[in-house]
Amino acid sequence: MSYYRWLGLYTRRVAKRGYTRDTIRGGASEWDVSRPFSSYVRTLGVLAVHPVRFFELLPKIPDPRAPALFLIFSGLLAAILWLLFGGLFPALVALVLPLPLSSLLAGLYHVGVLGGRYGYVVTWRVLAYPLGFYLPFAAVPVLGPLGAIFVGLVLMPIGLARVQEIGPLRAVLVGLVVAGLVGATCFFLFFA
């Protein structure tokens, strides 16, 4: 009897919906919970070097477990870096903010991809990995803005085009609009 059947995760009903043992555990491109550190480094490397391949292999299922845990793990690392570079309050914000922020940002991106092939949760899955990639870099003074540009204008359009199966021009326009909204919000909150 397999481990998944023993836990009751891989049943006939789950198999009928198209889930496999890999999609329950985390697909080929996803962060693997059983090996958090090595899988985290591998996920960051693939996102940085082969983003098209990462998003092509990303399972298009409405299962938030692996991306949510990836964001939480990224938030922990970001909190450690914020504690070193910014103090206690930014570190606490880095612990609490990733999941609610990802839900809000995914809503903005999903409005732009309405008519795409999949629903909101799949759009959120596309956002979760680049956001988790960005969180630790946000604490480092020079890398923060560069990471935001890379995530918002490179990774997100690639992910939206590949996963939601919308055109690349539309994906870039959605990325530009959301980046403009986020940039304007940050400017008015922190500088104006």
Question: Which residues does each PLM region occupy?
Answer:
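Soluble N-terminal domains of membrane-associated systems
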Residues: M1-K16
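Amphipathic alpha-helical interaction segments
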Residues: R12-V14, P62, G132
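Short, functional N-terminal and low-complexity linear motifs
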Residues: A15-T23, L95, T123-L127
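Selected alpha-helical membrane-embedding segments in polytopic membrane proteins
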Residues: R21-Y118
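Residue-level signal for alpha-helical context at structural boundaries
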Residues: P62, L69-F70, P141-V142, V178, ...
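Membrane-helix interface segments in multi-pass membrane proteins
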Residues: A78-L101, A138-G152, V182-A192
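Hydrophobic alpha-helical transmembrane segments and adjacent short intramembrane/lumenal linkers
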Residues: L105-F187
